[in-house]
Amino acid sequence: MNSMTSAVPVANSVLVVAPHNGYPVTPGIMSHVPLYPNSQPQVHLVPGNPPSLVSNVNGQPVQKALKEGKTLGAIQIIIGLAHIGLGSIMATVLVGEYLSISFYGGFPFWGGLWFIISGSLSVAAENQPYSYCLLSGSLGLNIVSAICSAVGVILFITDLSIPHPYAYPDYYPYAWGVNPGMAISGVLLVFCLLEFGIACASSHFGCQLVCCQSSNVSVIYPNIYAANPVITPEPVTSPPSYSSEIQANK
């Protein structure tokens, strides 16, 4: 092959020039093999990229976002467990003439389950920060948790707004569960408001991590090592001819 063979650089690759005539070439060292007329250097694409050629990601903001996401995820797990626990207690006060739309819809249980799952993924994302699927799943579930908490806020406000004719157990002893039920709904309302803020903050940090990871493209500056440099020979003066020497002697 007499013509120069070129390879288009792709991601995770290094360009190295190798001689056509088979002389060994050490990367980074200039070869002193002379260039022959019919032997031109070839460009080969060698897989792999040196560590010094990869652009590093700003690790400090990423680690900060991961730690904050882990803390918020732990709080989400606690809120989810509180929803399930208080929902179980609410089941005991329904016999006391307390009407709870949120309980009949099952929100304290499936809402708390969503909060626990999203919080668990936020904690797991801190342990595996380079897992794109885990970060994306955590982001999606945090968005779902934010929507669920907004629905919970509406349901618990509705529970507290429903007029209960038997709100005075002194006059209606069989309506003892109204006041405890309203207290539980009020506590769950506060937890839903807290969960909404945490889920929105976790979604914000998750968007930052996903965007940072998707934009983390390795920038490679290919180095071309000259295998057979072209050396221009210095002009050499030709020796005097025999006839010129005879004339000089005369």
UniProtKB/Swiss-Prot annotation:
Membrane topology reported for the UniProt record: Multi-pass membrane protein
Keyword Membrane: yes
GO terms under cellular component: plasma membrane
A Pfam family: CD20
Transmembrane segments: 75-95, 99-119, 137-157, 181-201
Classification via InterPro entries: CD20-like, MS4A
Primary localization class, coarse: membrane
Keyword Membrane among record annotations: yes
Biological process (GO), any one: cell surface receptor signaling pathway
Tissues/organs with expression: Expressed by hematopoietic tissues and cells lines.
Cytoplasmic face residues: 1-74, 120-136, 202-250
Keywords: Membrane, Receptor, Transmembrane, Transmembrane helix
Location of the protein in the cell: Membrane
Extracellular compartment residues: 96-98, 158-180
Function: May be involved in signal transduction as a component of a multimeric receptor complex.
Similarity annotation: Belongs to the MS4A family.
UniProt name for this protein: Membrane-spanning 4-domains subfamily A member 8
Organism expressing this protein natively: Homo sapiens
